[in-house]
Amino acid sequence: MESVLIRYPAPLRDALLDLRALILETAADLPEIGELRETLKWGQPAYLPKRPRIGTTLRIDGLRGEPTGHALFFHCQSSLGQEFRRHYGDALTILGDRSIILGIQEEPPLEPLRHCIALALTYHLRKRSPA
């Protein structure tokens, strides 16, 4: 995946590589999800548990027409947007039901992002678990 990310302009590339590292680190701390698959979906770097029905796909990319922004995209038909907004509506910029918007010039809020990544990667597991 680094060979894909290396094609981005330097500031955006660095921000996306940092976000990729955060996803990989978070996944490594979640033994219940098993191995993480790193692939391309719609031309964007994408991350999801290899085993089915564990979590939902996360994608990362720059923002079209916005050279200083990038995003963590999640499945728009999931309840993740509502969940992220409930937990971190004041700490994160959540666009609709599909993305968390980040700026390449600012330090991202790591703990809220890490938690949102974990929520996505365990999405189906959590739906099946008793409350």
Model-derived features: where do they sit?
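Charge-dense, helix-prone N-terminal extensions
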Residues: M1-A131
